[in-house]
Swiss-Prot record:
Free-text function comment from the UniProt entry: Forms a proton-selective ion channel that is necessary for the efficient release of the viral genome during virus entry. After attaching to the cell surface, the virion enters the cell by endocytosis. Acidification of the endosome triggers M2 ion channel activity.
Glycosylated residue positions: 20
UniProt topological domain (Virion surface) ranges: 1-22
Residues forming coiled coils: none
Record entry for activity regulation: The M2 protein from most influenza A strains is inhibited by amantadine and rimantadine, resulting in viral uncoating incapacity. Emergence of amantadine-resistant variants is usually rapid.
Recorded topology in the membrane: Single-pass type III membrane protein
GO BP, sorted A to Z: protein complex oligomerization; symbiont genome entry into host cell via pore formation in plasma membrane; symbiont-mediated suppression of host autophagy
Family: Belongs to the influenza viruses matrix protein M2 family.
Seems to be involved in pH gating (site feature) positions: 41
Lipid-binding residues (covalent, S-palmitoyl cysteine): 50
Entry-linked InterPro entries: Flu_M2 (IPR002089)
Name of the protein described by the UniProt record: Matrix protein 2
Ranges per topology, Intravirion: 44-96
């Protein structure tokens, strides 16, 4: 005899999900957490550059430039722009 004949198969009315219309608080909490997780994941994938740049730099635009010569300010701006440009290069385009 093969193993397939030994396995119990569920009857037709047991194929459905048993947690439908459940008032169990654990099921409700798990559903809410799952939905929130999915929403946050989608937002993260859509806006990850903005989000991580915000957490990295905060609301400030950068360090204060009081008392710093203009040449050093320009050098700092170029470094920041190069860092942003380099950040864009981590995407890989694969053409088949």
């Amino acid at each position: 005899m093969s193993l397939l004949t030994e396995v119990e198969t569920p009857i037709r009315n047991e194929w459905g999900c048993r947690c439908n219309d459940s008032s169990d608080p654990l099921v409700v909490a798990a559903s809410i957490i799952g939905i929130l997780h999915l929403i946050l994941w989608i937002l993260d994938r859509l806006f990850f550059k903005c989000i991580y740049r915000f957490f990295k730099h905060g609301l400030k635009r950068g360090p204060s430039t009081e008392g710093v010569p203009e040449s050093m300010r320009e050098e700092y701006r170029k470094e920041q722009q190069n860092a942003v440009d380099a950040d864009d290069s981590h995407f890989v385009s694969i053409e088949l």
